[in-house]
Amino acid sequence: KGIESFMAKNADKWLRKNKGYTELVLERAKSRHKFQMLKDASKKGRKAKRQRVEKLLDANERRRRELCTLFICEGDSAIGGLRSARNKLYQGGIALKGKPMNVAQSNIKDILANQEFTNIMASIGLTLGQPAELSDLRFSNIVFLADSDVDGGHINTLLTNFFFTFWPELFVAGAIQIAKAPLYE
């Protein structure tokens, strides 16, 4: 117990005197942790790319994927309307269950555990921690299709936040769009 108390007392003094070293060690530990999380995310993302997404209405075009559009819809009722109105050759769709999570307040582990985001990434061919190459994606256009109400606006904002946080190059390329649904009274 004497050695333990001596070490604790002197280690505390040393750490207070040498704050630069302490901060450096903490920064490196955080950096290693973030790198490991991105590495795990990349591995899980590559695995997810090979998965079949149950709720995906896929486009039938296989060769010219640059012509394909994915509609991310608010709920099963919206996807039902899309199912009958879409051009099956070039248009696909996936329905969200409720509001997606806010990635600004989440860590990578939570995002990867979120089934909605995992399905979206697998449907498009995106991987967290890797830039999006339009030529490699299953859909080169992504359209958010939500109701014209407060919830729909919030869903569009959360989806925009998700894509812009991890793949801002999709916005630069003009691949992300928001459909303005008509308002019925």
Kindly label every feature range from the protein language model.
Residues M101-V103:
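A short acidic, often aromatic-flanked loop/helix-cap motif at beta-alpha or helix-coil junctions
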Residues H33-K47, C68-T69, S84-A85, Q105-E185:
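C-terminal interaction appendages of subunits in large macromolecular complexes
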Residues K1-K99, A132-L134, N141:
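GHKL-family ATPase ATP-binding module
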